[in-house]
Swiss-Prot record:
Coiled coil: none annotated. It is an enzyme of class 6 (ligase). GO terms for molecular function: ATP binding; glutaminase activity; metal ion binding; NAD+ synthase (glutamine-hydrolyzing) activity; NAD+ synthase activity. The gene is nadE. Pathway: Cofactor biosynthesis; NAD(+) biosynthesis; NAD(+) from deamido-NAD(+) (ammonia route): step 1/1. Belongs to the NAD synthetase family. Keywords: ATP-binding, Ligase, Magnesium, Metal-binding, NAD, Nucleotide-binding. This is NH(3)-dependent NAD(+) synthetase. Pfam families: NAD_synthase (PF02540). Catalyzes the ATP-dependent amidation of deamido-NAD to form NAD. Uses ammonia as a nitrogen source. Deamido-NAD(+) binds at residue 112.
Length: 260
């Protein structure tokens, strides 16, 4: 079904305003990477909270220079207040102590470090942390637990990546950001497509069918292949969903022990 994106923008702005107010806050903070998702969230926050929406730019030693440039251009274009904190000195210390660390470990460290900066800023400024993960990432578990997945409110968490692209066009996000390959910018050469094996234009239709057909039920891979999806695609995506499902759950706490 074709979305009315102007109505969606109004809905998300209303959602942000009401949820932040409900939690007793007037200000928000979020990480701005120069990528699509954070740009969309940034512009939505700016529409609602104006000068009370603050962006943190947190480049690492592996961040591409154009990521920072794109983030700064967005801030200038939409009058977004921002602060820059380089996390490069900290990720270099991690690299010094863990020389054999995989790229995934390094990336997770940077993601959690950024969230530490965001929550420290939120305490200092009495602001609420806003999330920037889309539904495609959340379903796939393509994010860092207690890193980029951590937040108090997420306005785009129910939008698939392809929907975020369309929303971005209606928000007048710069074409430079729209046209760049999706990337978490966690290490040199990293991209979502390389990590996931497929572009979102291929993944999202499958994710939508999985949600529609198997919400709260075991995924039937054979039924998906009968719909025409490639068998290897189905296997890879469903495996990732099942493996990372725990990332969307609250911690499991043992029930109170009552001895007989």
């Amino acid at each position: 079904m074709q979305k009315d994106y102007q109505k969606l923008i109004a809905y998300l702005c209303d959602f942000l305003e009401k949820e932040v107010q409900k939690k007793g806050f007037k200000k928000v903070v979020y990480g701005l990477s120069g990528g699509l998702d954070s740009a969309v969230v940034g512009v939505l926050c700016q529409k609602v909270f104006k000068e009370n929406a603050h962006a943190l730019l947190m480049p690492s030693s592996a961040s591409m220079p154009e990521s920072k440039t794109d983030a700064l251009n967005l801030c200038e274009m939409f009058s977004i207040p921002y602060t820059e904190y380089s996390i490069a000195p900290y990720d270099k210390i991690f690299g010094f102590h863990f020389k054999d660390a995989s790229l995934t470990r390094k990336g997770n460290f940077c993601a959690r470090l950024r969230m530490a900066f965001l929550y420290d800023y939120s305490l200092k400024s009495d602001s609420l942390v806003i999330g920037t993960s889309n539904k495609s990432e959340r379903m796939l578990g393509y994010g860092t637990l207690f890193g980029d997945l951590a937040c108090a409110i997420n306005p785009i968490g129910e939008l698939f990546k392809t929907e975020v692209y369309e929303l971005a066009r209606h928000l007048n996000i710069p074409k430079k950001i729209l046209n760049k390959p999706p990337s978490a910018d966690l290490f040199v050469g990293q991209s979502d497509e390389k990590d996931l094996g497929y572009p979102y234009s291929v993944i999202d239709p499958l994710l939508k069918d999985i949600e529609a057909l198997f919400k709260n039920k075991p995924i039937d891979a054979e039924a998906l292949t009968q719909l025409g999806y490639d068998e290897i695609l189905v296997k890879n995506i469903t495996s990732r969903i099942q493996k990372n499902a725990f990332k969307l759950e609250l911690p499991t706490i043992a029930k109170r022990f009552n001895p007989e």
